[in-house]
Amino acid sequence: MSQPAKVLLLYAHPESQDSVANRVLLKPAIQHNNVTVHDLYARYPDFFIDTPYEQALLREHDVIVFQHPLYTYSCPALLKEWLDRVLSRGFASGPGGNQLVGKYWRSVITTGEPESAYRYDALNRYPMSDVLRPFELTAAMCRMHWMPPIIVYWARRQSPQTLASHAKAYGEWLANPVSAGGY
């Protein structure tokens, strides 16, 4: 039996203590030996990112999960800084930038609005696939495999049972993320 893929879960929430949904989603992740949970806001409260350390972490893992709330149609500020610093030219892209080739990228995102708000004729004017296009393009730039994102819409308003169901499915996927496909 082969070993499950090594997963680096980059967790970025500036107010983690207030996010019930993200805390529930993290519970199964910390129970898997193949998953490294890396809380960026806990590690870098000053936003000074240790780029060589972060790049070494990326090299050691097969699947990179970016778990965060959707902030202004993007990610929280520290994760954006992390993307700009760590996925640098010569490491992740450009000449010699082949360190992430063939690895997997998966976004796990919580939103404050229902799925129906993400349509051309709705509040946010664009479907979630369009909103997440910059992340998909970043994965392509790094020559990583883009996996369908996991979205928990209207996270604050989900029942404990619904959140538990998402967490269970997420945990099952994390146990064997490459062969399990989407959840």
Swiss-Prot record:
Pfam families: Flavodoxin_2 (PF02525). The keyword Zinc-finger does not apply. It is found in: Cell inner membrane. It is a peripheral membrane protein. Its EC number is 1.6.5.2. The keyword Mitochondrion does not apply. One of its GO terms (cellular component) is plasma membrane. InterPro entries: Flavodoxin_fold, Flavoprotein-like_sf, K_H_efflux_KefG, KefG/KefF. Keywords: Cell inner membrane, Cell membrane, Membrane, NAD, Oxidoreductase. It catalyses: a quinone + NADH + H(+) = a quinol + NAD(+); a quinone + NADPH + H(+) = a quinol + NADP(+). GO terms for biological process: positive regulation of potassium ion transmembrane transport; potassium ion transport. One of its GO terms (molecular function) is NAD(P)H dehydrogenase (quinone) activity. HAMAP family: K_H_efflux_KefG (MF_01415). NCBIfam families: PRK04930.1. Regulatory subunit of a potassium efflux system that confers protection against electrophiles. Required for full activity of KefB. Belongs to the NAD(P)H dehydrogenase (quinone) family. KefG subfamily. Interacts with KefB. This is Glutathione-regulated potassium-efflux system ancillary protein KefG. It comes from Salmonella typhimurium (strain LT2 / SGSC1412 / ATCC 700720).
